[in-house]
Amino acid sequence: MKVVYVGRDSKRHKALVAQHLDVIVLLHDNWDDFTYKTTFPTECRIKGSDVEIGGIQILIENEKTTFAYLDKLVADGWDGVFPIPGSQYVSVPASLSFYEQIDGHLGLDAAIEVARTLRDASFLAKIEDDGDALRLLATEGFRKSLQRERGAIKAYLDGWKLFGRKTISIGNQIFRFRKPGEDISTIELRFASASPLPHDINVMIGPNGVGKSQLLHQIVANWLKLDPDIPADTGFNGRPNLNQVVVISYSPFELFPVDTSQDKNRKDHDVYRYFGFRGRMKSLTESKRGSDKITLSREFPKTNAARSLLACLSDDQKYGAIKEWSKKLETMERVLKSAFPFDRAAVVIDGDADVDSFFATQEWMTEPYLEGPAWDEDGPNLQVRYVPIASDRVDELKVLVLGKHLQDRLGVVFLKDGKPLHLSSGQRLFSYIVINILGAIRRNSLILIDEPELFLHPTLEIAFIRMLKSILASYGSKALVATHSLVAVREIPRDCVHVFEQTDQGLAIKTPPFET
């Protein structure tokens, strides 16, 4: 597979895409990582079709601005085809999906060939023990630029496992944290297990004020740090091989960050996702310009779920060729049908929109959409269309068009026998949480859940833990739950239960002496 740098040369870019069935084209980007400019967006064609693989960062020895160095080579006669002549360099993709997509479409040999061509840091350091690569890995440029974003860190830590066909999983994690006015405490999250019992979920239990939610907030703050050289006495012990942190918290009093949109120094904003009753909403300021103000609203679970269901569809379309991909819509249907019966989940679309524009084809579809009134507890009935988002029609639906006409404030509607299904408030919130997690989750994510008993009654709380186990297993991910409830603890092995207790000597974290 050919890899070619074109930079700003749009004419050559178009010609390469038109001429080659299998090609990766590297484009120009001026993104600055602590004075290093190493980032390249890509366009990838495989077997004549567009495939989304994400960007890549390339560090050249003794150079801070990679595109300027490559532009000079092109001016001196280089045709832009990799490998770069007469240069020592290493690269790291923005995420593991870069090579997973190539593997899924063309096979592992093709992915390894591209890794050699781009001198992938993980492949060269951990499989080939390449001395030139190891020297570059010890530089400031690699540490501050190629290992700045969490997706790139994960790609470096675990990329070699993909090339060696080894299982990529999250191991035990040690985290140091501090309660105000107290010494540092340490918790070991036991995610790796030699026993047959799954260790995908760890639970913290203890009274209010003992430090459980404080720990979750400190995990988020540490995860969102960008500069690896900032000294800290708290945080993860080493760089965790995580892809993403997702927070689920439906307390009206919590103050987790709702997103990272205000962080202009961050390129990958999906590395952290939050779902709860808080979010950004446009409001008019004194100057009459719209500003994104963080507000509290029970609309957010509904709007997030509608958007997340389309995200599940989009991910299944983009990443379906990856060998280890667990299809999100199939997972959603399997998990939720164990909680209540339904035929399909649907989104609500404008009643006056051109319905044909939502579909690539309707030829093989039964009931591509339904029409009827939308029951909205907060407003008048509207005449709308329900478009099922289901695993049997992934390739027939157009995500971008659906997104433009989406009535997201009406949430996700479940259809049974051709009619909207009425759910209790608990069932609705349960379904929204499942869909939100699936819409956001990447492989090897850490899900943080704060006090699920606040928003789920005991029967649904048990179903929630079992649902969580199923999703985590499908995506190689883990969860940490803070709770007061013994219901959740009963579903978890004893060595994954952390009992928080305030003593005269400070905070004590213990494991139950017997299976819970």
Question: What are the residue ranges of the model-derived segments?
Answer:
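Long, basic/Gly/Ser/Thr-rich N-terminal segments
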Residues: 1-167
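Short acidic (Asp/Glu) and glycine-rich catalytic loops that position anionic groups and cofactors
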Residues: 245, 313-314, 502-506
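A broad structural signal for short, well-ordered beta-strand segments within beta-sheet-rich domains
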Residues: 170-172, 242, 476
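A structural signal for short, well-ordered beta-strand segments and their strand-loop junctions
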Residues: 246-249, 344-350, 448, 480-481, ...
